[in-house]
Amino acid sequence: MQRWTAAIAQSDGFVFITPEYNYGPAAVLKNAIDWVYPEWNRKAAAFVSYGSAGGARSVQQLRLTAIELQLAPVRLSVHIPVASLWAHFQGGDVEAGLAELAVPAGAMIDDLLWWTAALKTARASAS
């Protein structure tokens, strides 16, 4: 866990990728997030999820956790409906499926990068 904690401490922003299980994020991800506290503080976070409702319910729960950990979750996220995911993997055009995600993913990453830079500057000036 020391390597995990150190990796979080050295990073300025995060993209969490999770499936949705029983209306929530993967337990192993939640456990890994909960293991660390001060290293998350005042850093930006974004979310990519997949599931029956695009994983939206797992992201809702992770946003609440992120706020409690003093992370700053960006508004935009990428939700991949499992029906669309399976269609692409069962002989469908995987490239087309990925292309559909390019615009929302790009907007989310742009937002994450802006907040990451702003919060990094703010953390440095507070030290």
Language-model regions: role of each:
Residues 1-72:
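Helix-loop-strand module that forms the ligand-binding subsite of alpha/beta enzymes
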Residues 74-127:
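Glycine-rich phosphate/pyrophosphate-binding loop and the adjoining helix
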